[in-house]
């Protein structure tokens, strides 16, 4: 895909899996792991600059990533204090690893392997329609998000106490929504979530 757009993805994978009780991102999923499945779908879409932010269970998740054929395309960043920081802090850490050539950056959840490769493809196709592309289901925002490089400065400047969703609300006029299925709202928090979705 030499003519593919230059896009990075920051995969947020620093959570502590408290409700799962184990390293959920390294659990089996399809022919790989939960985190592996997430990364595979971006790689299959030509996203070659993949930044994964680790935190809780960092070694287990890193080992799962090492088993991917395209591991050389993955940059590891670590949130050293996942207990006392928020998702937006992990995002900032991840953005330090994006390629200088990238025109857009996906912000993705490491525990959302349900999202299809096709949703990501459609988001990439829409990238020129607005600075922010968000998949939605029944009027609810989902993940991943696709953000133009031009907005990364304001995203990095979100003040303490504010969230990534606060930032989206402030930039509502710059969002194009992609209608998708409910998978864009899903994640894996409990053993019940994992068993239901992995066997579906």
List the predicted regions and their residue ranges:
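Conserved alpha/beta core of the MobA/IspD/sugar-nucleotide pyrophosphorylase nucleotidyltransferase superfamily
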Residues: 2-5, 159-200
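Short aromatic/basic micro-patch
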Residues: 28, 114, 146, 187-188
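Short beta->alpha linker loops
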Residues: 30, 56-57, 82, 86, ...
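Conserved N-terminal catalytic core of the sugar/cofactor nucleotidyltransferase
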Residues: 35-104, 118
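Hydrophobic packing residues within well-ordered alpha-helices of enzyme cores
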Residues: 20, 61-65, 123, 155, ...
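Short, conserved active-site loop motifs that form the nucleotide-linked donor/cofactor pocket
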Residues: 73-76, 132, 175
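N-terminal glycine-rich phosphate-binding loop and ensuing alpha1 helix
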Residues: 3-57
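Conserved beta-loop-beta/alpha segment of the NTase-like Rossmann-fold superfamily
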Residues: 83-149, 153-156
């Amino acid at each position: 895909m030499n003519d593919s757009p230059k896009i990075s993805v920051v995969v947020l994978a620093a959570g502590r899996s408290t409700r799962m009780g184990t390293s959920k991102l390294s659990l089996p999923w399809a022919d790989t792991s939960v985190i592996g499945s997430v990364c595979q779908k971006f790689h299959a879409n030509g996203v070659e600059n993949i930044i994964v932010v680790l935190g809780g269970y960092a070694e287990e998740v890193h080992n799962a990533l090492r088993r991917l054929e395209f591991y050389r395309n993955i940059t590891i960043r670590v949130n050293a204090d996942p207990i006392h920081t928020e998702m937006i802090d992990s995002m900032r850490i991840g953005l330090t690893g994006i390629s200088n050539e990238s025109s857009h950056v996906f912000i993705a959840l490491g525990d959302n392997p349900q999202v299809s490769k096709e949703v990501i493809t459609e988001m990439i196709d829409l990238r020129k329609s607005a600075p922010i592309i968000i998949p939605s289901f029944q009027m609810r925002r989902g993940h991943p998000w696709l953000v133009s490089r031009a907005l990364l400065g304001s995203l990095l400047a979100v003040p303490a106490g504010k969230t990534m969703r606060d930032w989206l609300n402030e930039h509502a006029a710059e969002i194009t929504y992609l209608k998708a299925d409910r998978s864009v709202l899903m994640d894996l928090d409990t053993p019940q979530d994992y068993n239901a979705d992995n066997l579906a």
